[in-house]
């Protein structure tokens, strides 16, 4: 028989941990961009912004709205829009922009355009020696913000306040507010959410959108063959 005092102790411990989390966690405003149902029955997309100051929060919400409109105009997301919720957490940075240390060998015309900004998630270009690879270095801060503000997230977009082209996949689909931001978001979401490989080969392993099967009738995407030019 389990000692009731042990149960009481663990209940107290859990309550204490929960209270400490509430006291130490930082709560930010969360804007509902698109709501189609309860969070426990929808795919919940959460946007984080990096390099947006408090004075630029309205710009951030406008930028998110443009990306969401473009995202759900694209197939297959347009077909399943009612299955998604979208939220934007308003996390201000101390300075506007991001980092470009100029350390990549493929910076091209941006080679001499070196700059730094004090941002909440410490995003930077030139990651792993690739100029366009834009990543948040402070991922622990991103997880803390998500846990404290939108704990039921499924997909995370991190939008960086710069017009220079860049992005990355991984746990956070990251992209800049470049003119091609919607296309970058759709592309990186394929990596982060669907686990898809790039449309070009460089290395790696077989993924959901890759196959060695030469017979199209046996391909994994056979049910969608020739639908919207899928081949």
Residue ranges and their predicted role:
Residues 59-60, 166-186:
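Short pre-active-site segment immediately N-terminal to the catalytic Zn-binding motif
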Residues 97-100, 139-175:
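Catalytic zinc-binding patch centered on the HExxH motif and its immediate surroundings
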Residues 182-199:
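Active-site recognition of the HExxH zinc-binding catalytic motif
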Residues 26-146, 180:
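Propeptide-to-catalytic entry region of secreted or membrane-anchored zinc metalloproteases
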């Amino acid at each position: 028989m389990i000692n009731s005092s042990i149960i009481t102790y663990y209940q107290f411990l859990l309550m204490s941990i929960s209270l400490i989390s509430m006291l130490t966690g930082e709560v930010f405003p969360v804007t509902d961009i698109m709501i189609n149902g309860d969070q426990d029955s929808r795919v919940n997309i959460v946007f984080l912004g990096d390099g947006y100051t408090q004075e630029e929060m309205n710009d951030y919400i406008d930028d998110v709205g443009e990306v969401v409109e473009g995202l759900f105009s694209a197939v297959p997301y347009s077909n399943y829009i009612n299955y998604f919720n979208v939220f934007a957490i308003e996390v201000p940075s101390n300075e506007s922009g991001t980092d470009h240390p100029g350390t990549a060998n493929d910076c091209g015309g941006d080679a001499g355009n070196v700059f730094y900004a004090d941002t909440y998630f410490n995003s930077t270009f030139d990651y792993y020696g690739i100029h366009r690879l834009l990543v948040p270095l402070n991922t622990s801060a991103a997880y803390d913000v998500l846990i404290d503000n939108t704990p039921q997230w499924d997909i995370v977009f991190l939008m960086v306040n710069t017009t220079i082209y860049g992005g990355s996949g991984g746990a956070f689909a990251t992209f800049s507010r470049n003119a091609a931001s919607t296309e970058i978001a759709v592309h990186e979401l394929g990596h982060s959410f669907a686990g898809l490989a790039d449309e070009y080969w460089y290395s790696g392993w077989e993924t959901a959108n890759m196959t060695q099967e030469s017979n199209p009738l046996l391909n994994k995407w056979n049910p969608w063959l020739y639908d919207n030019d899928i081949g």
